[in-house]
UniProtKB/Swiss-Prot annotation:
InterPro entries, sorted: MnmA-like, MnmA-like_C, MnmA-like_central, MnmA-like_central_sf, Rossmann-like_a/b/a_fold
Transmembrane segments: none
Protein name according to UniProt: tRNA-specific 2-thiouridylase MnmA
Disulfide bonds: 120-217
Region ranges (Interaction with tRNA): 166-168
Catalysed conversion reaction: S-sulfanyl-L-cysteinyl-[protein] + uridine(34) in tRNA + AH2 + ATP = 2-thiouridine(34) in tRNA + L-cysteinyl-[protein] + A + AMP + diphosphate + H(+)
Intracellular or extracellular location(s): Cytoplasm
GO terms assigned for molecular function: ATP binding; tRNA binding; tRNA-uridine 2-sulfurtransferase activity
SUPFAM superfamilies, sorted: Adenine nucleotide alpha hydrolases-like
Lineage: Bacteria, Pseudomonadati, Pseudomonadota, Alphaproteobacteria, Rhodobacterales
Binding site for ATP: 26-33, 52, 144
Amino acid sequence: MPLDPSPTLNSLGFAKPPAETRVVVAMSGGVDSSVVAAMLAEEGYDVVGVTLQLYDHGAALAKKGACCAGLDIHDARRVSEKMGFPHYVLDYENIFKDAVIDEFAESYLGGATPVPCIRCNERVKFKDLLETAKDLDADCMATGHYIQRKSGPYGAELHSAADANRDQSYFLFSTTPEQLAFLRFPLGHLPSKEDTRALAEKYGLSVANKPDSQDICFVPDGDYASVIRKLRPEAAAPGDIVDTDGRVLARHDGVVNYTIGQRRGLGIGGLATPLYVIKLDAEARQVVVGPKSMLSTRTVPVREINWLGDEPFQSRDAWHLAVKVRSTRPPTDAIIRPISDTEATVELTSPEEGISPGQACVFYDTDSSRIYGGGWIHKG
């Protein structure tokens, strides 16, 4: 008797009907996650929407371009009511403050330029929320991120989004293989954000024309300095602006007001050569400035590496990959030399300016859209 053919997989990769496949959708209240939830509900999946209350407890009701607070929660609930699936709001404010906001402030005090969105994905959404999804007996968790999950010979692989302008791989490099096995990203293959909004119109969602979220969600109007001053008043302590020889050039009103690579607003005039911020020394309360040439570097120390390759990270003396050292910059060719399973020296083929501790260094394949993980840039 011939063997039965392999069972047909549904669109989420499970060998059972959508109605028997439970998927928790992480809903921020924006158009992306709303479309994911509506799309899966339309396909007949057993959808459960979950929104995290991360901050403000409603104080941001009227804030535009935020997520996970105030009106966004109501928007997510309206989508669930329209599409007919349950929706839950979980209070994660304390977890979010401890895991993301406090570290954001501490990192800045330490002279780094942190990326809190990565820590939020790593420590809140893809950790605690993912465990909540499992507690709800979900088969998987779906999000509205623009990134792709593809099946490879050794398991699920992380790939850049089809729309390079919307690609969020820089913010998701720390996704572990175990998390990736459970996650789904239904929007990653779409050619453009216009396609997402067209789907929102198709499903009749009220968020179809809602603006995209901007900046850091817990920072009003992009004024991160005010948030840090509130959390850590010592960040506003005045100090000296000095050159690389320690010569005092001016005074400043808190290192929190400066970033690596900054030129304007230093209060230094009359010099033949323009000066840029090249280092922040929060402990000494010093802003160190120097010529633009000192912003360039080819060697980047990276730690806390999350490796997503098929071979062990230390199986080679060097990996020839492309890396991103800022979310807004394209990948550049580099040689990655492992020091341990979680630490490496990255040698850039071409020097980059303004590389700052606290930023991520994300690894990409040079011949495909695959992401090989990444790590955090540390002080040399």
